[in-house]
Swiss-Prot record:
GO terms for biological process: amino acid biosynthetic process; aromatic amino acid family biosynthetic process; chorismate biosynthetic process. Its cofactor is Co(2+); Zn(2+); NAD(+). Catalyzes the conversion of 3-deoxy-D-arabino-heptulosonate 7-phosphate (DAHP) to dehydroquinate (DHQ). Zn(2+) binds at E184, H246, H263. This is 3-dehydroquinate synthase. One of its GO terms (cellular component) is cytoplasm. GO terms for molecular function: 3-dehydroquinate synthase activity; metal ion binding; nucleotide binding. Pathway: Metabolic intermediate biosynthesis; chorismate biosynthesis; chorismate from D-erythrose 4-phosphate and phosphoenolpyruvate: step 2/7. Binds 1 divalent metal cation per subunit. Can use either Co(2+) or Zn(2+). Its EC number is 4.2.3.4. The lineage of its organism: Bacteria, Bacillati, Bacillota, Bacilli, Lactobacillales.
Length: 355
């Protein structure tokens, strides 16, 4: 299956195909001339797939180097970025060469940021290996790293030259890593895709059912995201809909310590919390919070987090990228399958943090 992100200045394809990882060399040779490449990955993914990818790329005529770092959100920072810059310089990577991001969301965000800033920008592609990355972070060109103050505080908008998704690699994920990806999938059903929501409703919620439906839910999710990105590449309008649950979710990730609460888990908690308060205020329909809770719990996603520190969460929210002056744009779901933006004074976010 193939989807096109038809941006006027930089169109590219998303290829979704079981077994695609073994064909990465032939896929990339259709995008780039044989040249020098650096595969950026983490130590866990490197053990699983780096050699397989390297051999496929070398068979297609590419000269391949691999840079890996310690897996986890805690590595997504400027220290790791600087180590990557040093590695690229040592192997002599130039602007005519490229970067392959091989891994989950942390790898994709960091590798994309490195590619967009090294020598003022070199070509890169995304090969996501986690469900979260396959349905969300590998698409749309957002790159970035965390700081002690906020998640993804430093980053760029830089589109990849292509995205290659192999659903079969999900079989090597741990159960928690697989389940957390469903946080983003549930979000897509809520904000845009009623057909996806119906498919999720029919699933039994087990890890086996996720793997069985993987190709379909990845396709639906990517289709929603690529349409929104085409309409609003730089996050000024409808692309903000993709942040449903993320305002509070990012604050949870930051206050818990990066990596303690996984991204999809934090999004699930954020969706439930904002819906609970918005429903009480009449901003979302009656009963929708229970629907979200039921769907999240069915797939094993958390719907609450302890310790819930309202003051710490609020301080993290003040660094949110959706904040503008003393106000913030909060994404709500007025009905299943649609979203809107509710701009409120930043101070009012304290109400949305109350239990």
């Amino acid at each position: 299956m193939k989807l096109n992100v038809n941006l006027p200045h930089h169109p590219y394809d998303i290829v979704i195909e079981n077994g695609a990882l073994s064909q990465v060399g032939s896929w990339l040779s259709q995008l780039w001339q044989p040249q020098k490449l650096v595969v950026i990955t983490d130590n866990r993914v490197a053990r699983l797939y780096a050699e397989k990818v390297k051999l496929s790329l070398e068979a297609a005529g590419f000269k391949v180097f691999t840079f890996d770092f310690l897996e986890g959100e805690a590595s997504k920072n400027l220290t790791t970025v600087n180590k990557a810059y040093e590695f690229l310089a040592k192997v002599g990577l130039t602007r005519s060469d490229g970067i392959v991001a091989l891994g989950g969301g942390v790898v994709g965000d960091l590798a994309g940021f490195v590619a967009s800033t090294y020598m003022r920008g070199i070509h890169f592609v995304q090969i996501p290996t986690s469900l979260t990355a396959q349905v969300d972070s590998s698409i749309g060109g957002k790159t970035g790293v965390n700081t002690p103050w906020a998640k993804n505080m430093v980053g760029t908008f830089t589109q990849p030259d292509g995205v290659l998704i192999d659903p079969e690699v999900l079989h090597t994920l741990g159960q928690r890593e697989l389940i957390e990806g469903m946080g983003e999938v549930v979000k897509y059903g809520l904000i845009e895709d009623k057909e996806l929501w119906d498919e999720l409703s029919e699933m039994d919620g087990s890890p086996e059912s996720i793997l069985e439906h993987a190709e379909s839910i990845i396709y639906h999710s990517c289709d929603v995201k690529r349409k929104i990105v085409i309409e609003d590449e730089l996050d000024n309008g409808v692309r903000l809909y993709l942040n449903f649950g993320h305002t509070i979710g990012h604050a949870i990730e930051a206050t818990a310590g990066y990596g303690q609460v996984m991204h999809g888990e934090a999004v699930a908690i954020g969706m439930v919390q904002v819906s609970r308060v918005a429903e009480k205020q009449g901003l979302m329909p009656a009963g929708i919070t229970e629907d979200i809770i039921h769907m999240c719990q069915k797939f094993g996603l958390p719907v609450d987090y302890q310790p819930w520190n309202e003051n710490a969460l609020y301080q993290a929210l003040t660094h949110d990228k959706k904040a503008r002056g003393n106000s913030i744009k909060l994404v709500l779901v007025p009905e299943l399958g649609s979203a809107n933006i509710h701009q409120i004074p930043l101070e009012e976010m304290k109400e949305f943090l109350k239990k």
